[in-house]
């Protein structure tokens, strides 16, 4: 039974880490270079994360400066940002891109909250898939007479209780993210 608990914790922790990573790429009231983690630049025919081809700095509260390591990528980086869902317009001075980040409108914040909710639901599904995988493993062990029916019932109950706990954590993370997004 401890084997199931350890396996569940390991897989659910990965789900929570992935959710956290996904949420870092959502724009909130605070500016972060993590916003650009999912922006892919065409780098010699390969789609490469922006963070691997440029230095991203935030010298002021509402200003982002992107300095490519290879100046020939400047226009490709600009295109990648324009085609992303970040709603940002970079301006180039020939060597760096500057992005003045406007304050988010209430409507845009609500859109981002909807996006965060959708992401949270996807991760709840992932958590339920982990539960289903472990339930099937336990049922197979019972079918193969490796564990008793009582053990199976206990294992399934433990898996369900722990899954509910992880889904509650996903909801708490979503609530915190919503609060962060809606801050002015």
UniProtKB/Swiss-Prot annotation:
This is Ribosome-recycling factor. SUPFAM superfamilies: Ribosome recycling factor, RRF. Belongs to the RRF family. It comes from Borrelia hermsii (strain HS1 / DAH). One of its GO terms (cellular component) is cytoplasm. Its main location: cytoplasm. One of its GO terms (biological process) is translational termination. The keyword Protein biosynthesis applies. One of its GO terms (molecular function) is ribosomal large subunit binding. The gene is frr. Keywords: Cytoplasm, Protein biosynthesis.
